[in-house]
Regions:
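Alpha-helical scaffolding within the catalytic cores
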Residues: 103-119, 141-153
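Metal-dependent polysaccharide deacetylase catalytic core of the NodB/CE4 family, i.e.
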Residues: 1-75, 79, 87, 94-104, ...
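Flexible, glycine-rich surface segments
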Residues: 79, 92, 112-115
Length: 177
């Protein structure tokens, strides 16, 4: 599929990137992180290792991996951004845009990104279902409110692009469908 971009989403799906930078294995209260026995978290393994694995074993020949979608709190450290750049990866995620009828304010619209030292982290245009469902604790129908965000950020002027970002596990709850 020529219009599909292959991305890495890391090796263990860390929730706290600052902990990975320190070699600390931590998980969010809700889980969300793989914990291989004996694994010591490493930015190189999470970023470069996962990218190399996809390039060598999963991607079609000639199809590059050029994107890292940050996991968890999507708050990489400056060093994580530097490693990503050296690996030839663009990066994106975070930002927490959730403007809706509940939060009808431009203050609920995240910026385009944030500068960390010499690096720039591009934020996702609109957040995934986790933000709308309180980190997948409910209400599980919460992601339907993303339509309110699309409307809020699109009129009277488009201030954010539209993207649909969700995890396939959200189909495990009837309310989320």
């Amino acid at each position: 599929l020529p219009s599909v971009e292959i991305a890495t989403h890391s090796y263990t799906h860390p929730f706290y990137w600052a902990d990975v930078d320190k070699g600390i294995a931590s998980t969010a209260a809700q889980g969300y992180t793989l914990t291989p026995p004996g694994y010591i978290p490493s930015l190189e393994r999470e970023i470069v290792g996962s990218t190399d694995y996809i390039r060598q074993r999963l991607a079609p020949a000639g199809k590059p991996v050029r994107l890292l979608l940050w996991t968890g709190n999507a708050a990489p450290t400056e060093r994580a951004l530097a490693i990503s750049e050296r690996a030839g990866l663009l990066t994106m995620n975070g930002g927490n845009t959730i403007a809706s009828r509940t939060y009808p304010s431009l203050t609920a619209v995240g910026p385009l990104g944030i500068r960390l030292g010499e690096h720039f982290q591009a934020y996702a245009p609109i957040m995934n279902e986790n933000v709308f469902t309180n980190l997948w604790t409910g209400p599980f129908y919460g992601f339907e409110r993303v339509i309110e965000t699309f409307r809020f950020t699109g009129s009277p002027r488009r201030i954010k692009p539209i993207d649909i970002y969700y995890h396939t596990y959200s189909a495990t709850k009837r309310a989320s469908l």
